Swiss-Prot record:
Cofactor: Mg(2+); Mn(2+)
EC number: 6.5.1.2
Heme among keywords: no
InterPro entries tied to this protein: BRCT_dom, BRCT_dom_sf, DisA/LigA_HHH, DNA_ligase, DNA_ligase_AS, DNA_ligase_CS, DNAligase_adenylation, DNAligase_N
Official protein name in the record: DNA ligase
Family the UniProt entry places it in: Belongs to the NAD-dependent DNA ligase family. LigA subfamily.
Pfam families documented for this protein: BRCT, DNA_ligase_aden, DNA_ligase_OB, DNA_ligase_ZBD, HHH_2, Nlig-Ia
Amino acid sequence: MTNLEKMREKLQDQINYHNVLYHQKNKPEISDAEYDELKKKLAEIEPEIYATQESVGAPPDERFSKVEHQEPMLSLENAYDEQGVEKFLSKIKRFLIEDKIEILCEPKIDGLSFSAIYEDGRFVKAATRGDGFVGEDVTHNVATIKGFPKFLQGVQGRLEVRGEIYISNSDFLKLNENDEFANPRNAAAGSLKQLDANITASRPLRYFAYSLIGGAEKSQSEVLNKLEALGFCVNEHQSLTSSLDGMLKFYNEVYNCRYNLDYDIDGIVYKVNDLVLQNRLGNTHKAPRSALAYKFSAVYAKTKLNKIFIQVGRTGVLTPVADLVPVNIGGVLVSRASLHNQDEIKRKDIREGDIVTIKRAGDVIPQIVEVSRDSRLPNTPEFVFPEVCPECGSKVRQVEGEAAVRCPEEFACKAQIIEKLKHFVSKDAFDIVGLGDKQIEFFYDLGLIKQIPDIFTLEERLDEFNLEEQSGWGKKSIAHLLNAIQSRRVITLDRFIFSLGIRFIGQVAAELLADYYVSYDNWYNSMIELSSDNTELVGIDGIGKKVAESLESFFSKEHNIKMLNDLTACLQILPVSSNSSNSVLNNKIIVFTGKLLAMSRGEAKVRAKTLGAKVSSHLSAKTDYLIAGEKPGSKYKKAVELGVEILDEDQWHKVISLGVFK
């Protein structure tokens, strides 16, 4: 066995060892960054093995068959202070035009979400939340949970119960005598996701049910009562209130007694109690508008800041990052923290070698909140922010009024090009299996992939670069990669727009643009004309001036136009298909003016979009309908001049309720 083979085997053994600790025992010994470094080293030695690992996937959920949720299991919007709760309550009141809304308050259990399906009262399937749309089948494992109902008396048809699986603190202490798990949540997750249901049965899993889909209940409080009547465990701590004071009072009461509970909670969940109002509020792209999680205060820990290093992102921003001595904060090993920008470093006087206090709140990136100057060594120098890009050496720039420092060489800076390529192939964009970070860097350095279109012409240039002769690459790994690329030549418009990595164009903005323009040609042609007129783009509901300016800048550069033309010659970009094709509003451009009496402007926009309409604030000859409420503005007069059809509020209600105009 050669030294290279020995090293490869050693790295593979280390990765396998840490996979077991993380995914099965839920007791990681190293940070995510250190784990990624092991995988990168293996990739350098044997890209073929690395590509295979990337396609199969290490997470344990790949071992389970998939279950598609009929209704998405969305996450909740979070608040971390009282102002966030007040904002939530004010927003739903404005949306519904209601002065008083009943809110049900419940503890937020720190466990693992589940869905259980019953057919004619018989338990038939259980699934994890997964990505919210597709979960893992854990039917046999959930069936082993003590006291979990297998049959519901008197229930007909399909009924879905949702809740949270957890392990109590007292049971966790007994289970964790050998210190196998970091915390009760990890223990619950590891126990539920076992291939052998006998192992799950040996673990003290418990659950709370909190949601019912398919019932006849009219409120969340009725849902909880029904669940309890059916034999499900329901959390006893709950409160109904119609005021902000009542919501905050419940939070404080539970916060003060949380350590007396025998299970972990990480906040309070507020839900609009009336299910009809919940339905009217609907969902954003990621969460229901009718609920909020008020997370408990952040967890803090002290550690040493080893070094400050600079990352260059795909838009050229130089971001300082703190490399820390790894510290456990609330069961999570933290080895890096965000420093945001040079102003933040100066304001807090953060220096390398300092003892710092780290704050971690929910899913927010850990931050340095305090520096222990008493512990600082004498003559410790201030951190000097670089005046040139650490990647390409170009002089950096800072736009007046912005905190961000940028490298201006977007087409020449290696770091920016590589980060754009990584973004393009990432999971939420083209999702090309086998083209991970290390592969992108390898192909860039080799000269095979220098710009995005090169990905789809890779096969034509392989002989020129003798990839098969490169260390670790063979016919099999090359074939896998080419097949993965070939399978991604068809993509939806929103994912394509997002994949380009244009500043300010995240997934939400990309989806809004795709929904409005429907096809790539429509979008492209409209963007080309931005320099002369961007009023239509700015008028799209949810698209602001910054997005418009960013798109205008992107499409003003010949390099980007050529890249798009080269790229689209290799692809099929699917137009947006509407779920409301039978709606009279499908693909119609609608503008609102004046005050609506029966519903808020926000709700009216949501209803219009649900029916397939494109909502804009800009009225033009392209507008199909102007919805005019009380005291309409200048848009009414302009609509008359342009011959745009005008609907009053009564006509608008007939459209959204009956689908007719007259």
